[in-house]
Amino acid sequence: MANKSPHHKDGAWEVFAHGTDIGVRGFGLSRDRAFEEAAYALTAARADPESVRQHDIVEFVCNATSDALLLREWIGAVIREMSARQMLFSRYAVTSRNHGLTARAWGEPLDEDRHRLTARASGIAEAGLEVARDTEGNWMAQCVLDI
């Protein structure tokens, strides 16, 4: 299983198989963009993001002591909100601040007929959590979802 976005200049995402679980990975010119793309990959692991309308906005505040833990907190918060609100999101905006981030996600209530759900994440696995910056300054953020 591999599902990828077209690689754009400022960001891209992919969904990949990780044993019986699914991994999501975001790439960007900034950590914020990589986190946005990883969240978009989370949506793509569940449904076609293009089928999700941007009717409602949900705001997030996340804090952690490292980039990897911040990614886990961020993706975990998105998973929790998707579940609690029975929503899918198709657009994300992340802004870093000190040891955390603020974010917005745009989406709509779940419509199982139109959204054609494929997988449902219950959380983040301990393995596979990584946030890194390469020598050219590009960021990658990845985690493995418990399915």
Which residue stretches match the model-derived regions?
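N-terminal intrinsically disordered, cationic/polar leader segments
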Residues: 2-27, 31-147
